[in-house]
Structure formats: C-alpha cells, structure tokens
C-alpha cells in the first residue's frame, strides 16, 4: 500500500452537488427480510427522480448478481458484501448522488462501520421496523418457510439475530399507514435537513 496514493479529482463532491441542486447522502434502509425495505426505498427513489433529483438505489439481491456474486452467506461473506456496498455507496455519494441502500445488515457493528466512512450527516439510517410476525406473514420469497423447516440456516430473525438500531435517524413500520404517507415522511425529513430543496419537493406527491 505504500506506493498507492489517493488521486485528487479536479471536480470535487461540492461542485457535483451544486450542479445537481442537492446535497448527497446515503440513506441506509435496514430491517428484517420482508420488512418492506426495497419497496419503501424504491418508492422514495421514484418520487425523488420524478421531482428531478439524482439518485441511485442499491438493493441487497441485485448486488449479488454482479458486484458480490462470488460471495455466499457465511458471516465473513456477509461482512464483505456490506463492505463492498459501503465503498460503492461512498463513491456514489462523492459523485453527488442521493444513494438509497436496502440491506438487512443485521448487526450494529456492520452499520456503524459503514456510517464511520461518511462525514457527519451524510449517513442516514432508516430502520424499517416492521415486526417479525408481519414479515413472516408476508414472506414474499418463501424464505421464512424454508428457515422454519431448517432448509435455510443462519436466517436473520429466525436462527440468527437482528440487532435493531439504537438511534436511527428515522424509524418506519410499514405495517402501519400507507406507502405514500411513509414516502412523504422521508421526503419531509430530507427537506428539513437540506438534502433536497423545497422548490422541487413541492412537486413530490
């Protein structure tokens, strides 16, 4: 590593952010499988995109088709999966984007490690706190059935623990209220902390 030096770009994050009319951040959606992370993050991205903001959504399943296709589901591989995602998200934030990441990310240590890579205020933890009973009832991928039968081991919430955030910036239970109201709450929060400007957010339903 001694011969590797960080190359400073002629265009920095502040200039990219100014061009896009937004302050780049990473919104990290964490919660159990079936909690509604991807649905909520996807709906927020659609609303922001339609209002003219520059976004990208990193989804837990999607990154395993390419970036992390060589990884399994051991503790070590899960840690590496999130490490890679955190690094990619950091590059995207540096590019001036509002980045949304939807990952179970079950441990506080993992999430806090990613938070530590960002300046204060650029990592926004969104705890999708939908109860296990609701997630298991939804079971969109049939994973809980397999976990209960022993077909899947180390499944978060069943045979492996989920550590809920102690101080998430936002907490949303998708079993309460409708999706539009939940997205509106996220938009209002991003506006309040000056990630996005009010002129554009007036166009967001």
Swiss-Prot record:
InterPro entries: APS_kinase, P-loop_NTPase. Gene3D superfamilies: P-loop containing nucleotide triphosphate hydrolases (3.40.50.300). It comes from the Bacteria. The keyword ATP-binding applies. It is an enzyme of class 2 (transferase). ATP binds at residues 31-38. Keywords: ATP-binding, Kinase, Nucleotide-binding, Phosphoprotein, Transferase. Its EC number is 2.7.1.25. CDD domains: APSK. One of its GO terms (molecular function) is ATP binding. Pathway: Sulfur metabolism; hydrogen sulfide biosynthesis; sulfite from sulfate: step 2/3. It catalyses: adenosine 5'-phosphosulfate + ATP = 3'-phosphoadenylyl sulfate + ADP + H(+). One of its GO terms (biological process) is sulfate assimilation. The active site is at 105 (phosphoserine intermediate). Belongs to the APS kinase family. NCBIfam families: apsK, PRK03846.1. Catalyzes the synthesis of activated sulfate. PANTHER family: ADENYLYL-SULFATE KINASE 1, CHLOROPLASTIC, BIFUNCTIONAL 3'-PHOSPHOADENOSINE 5'-PHOSPHOSULFATE SYNTHASE. This is Adenylyl-sulfate kinase. It comes from Shewanella sp. (strain W3-18-1).
């Amino acid at each position: 590593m001694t011969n590797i030096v960080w190359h400073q770009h002629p265009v920095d994050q502040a200039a990219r952010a100014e061009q896009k009319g937004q302050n780049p951040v990473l919104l990290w959606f964490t919660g159990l499988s079936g909690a509604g992370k991807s649905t909520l993050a996807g709906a927020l991205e659609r609303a922001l995109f339609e209002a003219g903001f520059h976004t990208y959504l990193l989804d837990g399943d999607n990154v395993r088709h390419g970036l992390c296709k060589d990884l399994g589901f051991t503790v070590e591989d899960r840690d590496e999966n999130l490490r890679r995602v955190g690094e990619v998200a950091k590059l995207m934030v540096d590019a001036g984007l509002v980045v949304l990441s939807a990952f179970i990310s079950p441990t506080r240590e993992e999430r806090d490690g990613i938070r530590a890579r960002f300046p204060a205020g650029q990592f926004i933890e969104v705890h999708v706190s939908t109860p296990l009973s609701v997630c298991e009832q939804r079971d969109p991928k049939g994973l809980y059935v397999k976990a209960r039968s022993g077909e899947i081991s180390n499944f978060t919430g069943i045979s492996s623990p989920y550590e809920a955030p102690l101080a998430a910036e936002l907490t949303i239970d998708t079993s309460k209220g409708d999706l539009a109201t939940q997205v509106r709450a996220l938009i209002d929060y991003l506006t309040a902390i000056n990630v996005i400007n009010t002129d554009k957010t007036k166009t967001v339903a």
